[in-house]
């Protein structure tokens, strides 16, 4: 290096550990329409000022590192750095704050949830200056969301494909989740679909195990689909789980499903990964397959209130990465989900424009600029007595999925499906007539049971079943 170059490079450089606040805490910054905005719930270590902690989050999730480096002078940090532009204390909590960070759009690769998450929720979550950190929400600007595939088809196209309108769709996860042979599995699928369900589902655990290889399962399920369609005159579907150990194997399974004439495949998007999910979404769009998404592993990431990623962020990421359905919890069943929080991210999945509403945990106004919506799937510990509440909470654009609530019927699988179909149609009719499902729900089910022995038997079996636990994640 020449002396002249050494002198020029040394101008303005001061080695040492950074005070993040000096560069990355910018309370006067006015956010741009193209910025990606993040709301972090942060718990600093004792003695760490919230401004320093928020600035550290902005730095470590964008251009910063722990010390000043020579190469800072070779780029424009003001153009590329994240900025902590606001900090507010969390009501009722000691030493806990919401830090708002703005990221310039050029930090992220177009159409890549993988790159987005690698930056925003990467190493910063292990930062020693923070006792805990949780990403509560993201604002995705239209300039960025338009670079993503989004759902392969969306709600309206799915309705048109199925020719089913004006009610929630009904599903069932085949149980036991592991251990059935392919032929017995196909039999259960046929009985449920013949009884009146719209969909049946592979459990997320079912891939290709020694007791049931994927190709055998696909073949027997396809036979069940065509037989039930011929008998009922309705279009039926089964979520064939294409999740596999490699992307190549996953796509091979999706190709086989399409060749069999199946209308929908499934993917475990968190365990499978966003890159695999987006690849599958592209295939599904190009080949007319619907894509059902299971969220296995989500509670490891989102259930703790102070650390991790809220599911509303994972839901937004899925809408961008691609999926036509995603599991969202039930509010009333066995799985975690408070009503207002759940409806907040359900709207973020389905609607085109969602206003900021802190009462539902929505930190930013989100404009999806006509990106297709995703059907929320309510699944987990639900049965016929829950039908009025589920219909009232989730509305028509949803899938209500009863596994044990179908297959646990005392008379068998088909009567279990009949009970659920009668219950949902009774609830929809009552709602359309102006009745209040929240207050009259049990009466509506009892009235319908007088004309359906299958529903009456289901009501008797599950009349005492409740899951009354407080939600861990609350506002």
From Swiss-Prot:
<feature type="modified residue" description="N6-carboxylysine">
    <location>
        <position position="201"/>
    </location>
</feature>
<keyword id="KW-0934">Plastid</keyword>
<keyword id="KW-0503">Monooxygenase</keyword>
<protein>
    <recommendedName>
        <fullName>Ribulose bisphosphate carboxylase large chain</fullName>
        <ecNumber>4.1.1.39</ecNumber>
    </recommendedName>
</protein>
<keyword id="KW-0150">Chloroplast</keyword>
<feature type="modified residue" description="N-acetylproline">
    <location>
        <position position="3"/>
    </location>
</feature>
<comment type="function">
    <text>RuBisCO catalyzes two reactions: the carboxylation of D-ribulose 1,5-bisphosphate, the primary event in carbon dioxide fixation, as well as the oxidative fragmentation of the pentose substrate in the photorespiration process. Both reactions occur simultaneously and in competition at the same active site.</text>
</comment>
<keyword id="KW-0460">Magnesium</keyword>
<keyword id="KW-0602">Photosynthesis</keyword>
<feature type="active site" description="Proton acceptor">
    <location>
        <position position="294"/>
    </location>
</feature>
<comment type="similarity">
    <text>Belongs to the RuBisCO large chain family. Type I subfamily.</text>
</comment>
<keyword id="KW-0601">Photorespiration</keyword>
<dbReference type="InterPro" id="IPR036376">
    <property type="entry name" value="RuBisCO_lsu_C_sf"/>
</dbReference>
<dbReference type="Pfam" id="PF02788">
    <property type="entry name" value="RuBisCO_large_N"/>
</dbReference>
<feature type="binding site">
    <location>
        <position position="327"/>
    </location>
    <ligand>
        <name>substrate</name>
    </ligand>
</feature>
<feature type="binding site">
    <location>
        <position position="295"/>
    </location>
    <ligand>
        <name>substrate</name>
    </ligand>
</feature>
<feature type="binding site">
    <location>
        <position position="177"/>
    </location>
    <ligand>
        <name>substrate</name>
    </ligand>
</feature>
<keyword id="KW-0113">Calvin cycle</keyword>
<keyword id="KW-0120">Carbon dioxide fixation</keyword>
<keyword id="KW-0488">Methylation</keyword>
<feature type="binding site" description="via carbamate group">
    <location>
        <position position="201"/>
    </location>
    <ligand>
        <name>Mg(2+)</name>
    </ligand>
</feature>
<feature type="binding site">
    <location>
        <position position="379"/>
    </location>
    <ligand>
        <name>substrate</name>
    </ligand>
</feature>
<feature type="binding site">
    <location>
        <position position="173"/>
    </location>
    <ligand>
        <name>substrate</name>
    </ligand>
</feature>
<dbReference type="GO" id="GO:0009507">
    <property type="term" value="C:chloroplast"/>
</dbReference>
<dbReference type="GO" id="GO:0019253">
    <property type="term" value="P:reductive pentose-phosphate cycle"/>
</dbReference>
<dbReference type="InterPro" id="IPR020878">
    <property type="entry name" value="RuBisCo_large_chain_AS"/>
</dbReference>
<feature type="modified residue" description="N6,N6,N6-trimethyllysine">
    <location>
        <position position="14"/>
    </location>
</feature>
<feature type="binding site">
    <location>
        <position position="204"/>
    </location>
    <ligand>
        <name>Mg(2+)</name>
    </ligand>
</feature>
<keyword id="KW-0007">Acetylation</keyword>
<dbReference type="InterPro" id="IPR017443">
    <property type="entry name" value="RuBisCO_lsu_fd_N"/>
</dbReference>
<keyword id="KW-0456">Lyase</keyword>
<comment type="subunit">
    <text>Heterohexadecamer of 8 large chains and 8 small chains; disulfide-linked. The disulfide link is formed within the large subunit homodimers.</text>
</comment>
<dbReference type="GO" id="GO:0009853">
    <property type="term" value="P:photorespiration"/>
</dbReference>
<feature type="propeptide">
    <location>
        <begin position="1"/>
        <end position="2"/>
    </location>
</feature>
<feature type="binding site" description="in homodimeric partner">
    <location>
        <position position="123"/>
    </location>
    <ligand>
        <name>substrate</name>
    </ligand>
</feature>
<feature type="active site" description="Proton acceptor">
    <location>
        <position position="175"/>
    </location>
</feature>
<keyword id="KW-0560">Oxidoreductase</keyword>
<dbReference type="GO" id="GO:0000287">
    <property type="term" value="F:magnesium ion binding"/>
</dbReference>
<feature type="binding site">
    <location>
        <position position="203"/>
    </location>
    <ligand>
        <name>Mg(2+)</name>
    </ligand>
</feature>
<dbReference type="GO" id="GO:0016984">
    <property type="term" value="F:ribulose-bisphosphate carboxylase activity"/>
</dbReference>
<feature type="site" description="Transition state stabilizer">
    <location>
        <position position="334"/>
    </location>
</feature>
<dbReference type="InterPro" id="IPR036422">
    <property type="entry name" value="RuBisCO_lsu_N_sf"/>
</dbReference>
């Amino acid at each position: 290096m020449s002396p002249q170059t050494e002198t020029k490079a040394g101008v303005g450089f001061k080695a040492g550990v950074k005070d993040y606040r000096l560069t990355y805490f910018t309370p006067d910054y006015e956010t741009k329409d193209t910025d990606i905005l993040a709301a972090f719930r942060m718990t600093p270590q004792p003695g760490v000022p919230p401004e320093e902690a928020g600035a550290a989050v902005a730095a470590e999730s964008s251009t910063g590192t722990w010390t000043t480096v020579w190469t800072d002078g070779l780029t424009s940090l003001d153009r590329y750095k994240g900025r902590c532009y606001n900090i507010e204390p969390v009501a009722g909590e000691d030493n806990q704050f919401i830090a708002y960070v703005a990221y310039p759009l050029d930090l992220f690769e177009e159409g890549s949830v993988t790159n987005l998450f690698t930056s925003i929720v990467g190493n910063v979550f292990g930062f020693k200056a923070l006792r805990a950190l949780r990403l509560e929400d993201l604002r995705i600007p239209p300039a960025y969301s338009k670079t993503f595939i989004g759902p392969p088809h969306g709600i309206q196209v799915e309705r048109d494909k199925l020719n089913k309108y004006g009610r929630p769709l009904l599903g069932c996860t085949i149980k036991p989740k592991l251990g059935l042979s392919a032929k017995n599995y196909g039999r259960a699928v046929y009985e449920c679909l013949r009884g009146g369900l719209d969909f049946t589902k592979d459990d997320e655990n079912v891939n290709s195990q020694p007791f049931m290889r994927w190709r055998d399962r696909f073949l027997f399920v396809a036979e069940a689909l065509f037989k039930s369609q011929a008998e009922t005159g309705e279009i039926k579907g089964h979520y064939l789980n294409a999740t596999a150990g490699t992307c190549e194997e996953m796509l091979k399974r999706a190709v086989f499903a399409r060749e069999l004439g199946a209308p929908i495949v499934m993917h475990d998007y968190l365990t499978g990964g966003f890159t695999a999910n987006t690849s599958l979404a592209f295939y599904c769009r190009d080949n007319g397959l619907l894509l059902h998404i299971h969220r296995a592993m989500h509670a490891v990431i989102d259930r703790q209130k102070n650390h991790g990623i809220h599911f509303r962020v994972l839901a937004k990421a899925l809408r961008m990465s691609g999926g036509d359905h995603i599991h969202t919890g039930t509010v009333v069943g066995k799985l975690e989900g408070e009503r207002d929080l759940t409806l907040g991210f359900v709207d973020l999945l389905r609607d085109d424009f969602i206003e900021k509403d802190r009462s539902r945990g929505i930190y930013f106004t989100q404009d999806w600029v006509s990106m297709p919506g995703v059907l929320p799937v309510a699944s987990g510990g639900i049965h016929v007595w829950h039908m009025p509440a589920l219909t009232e909470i989730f509305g028509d654009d949803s899938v209500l999925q009863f596994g044990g609530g179908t297959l646990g019927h005392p008379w068998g699988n088909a009567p279990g499906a009949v009970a659920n179909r009668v219950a949902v149609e009774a609830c929809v009719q009552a709602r359309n007539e102006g009745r209040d499902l929240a207050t009259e729900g049990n009466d509506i089910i009892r009235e319908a049971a007088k004309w359906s022995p299958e529903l009456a038997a289901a009501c008797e079996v599950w009349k005492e079943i409740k899951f009354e636990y407080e939600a861990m994640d609350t506002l």
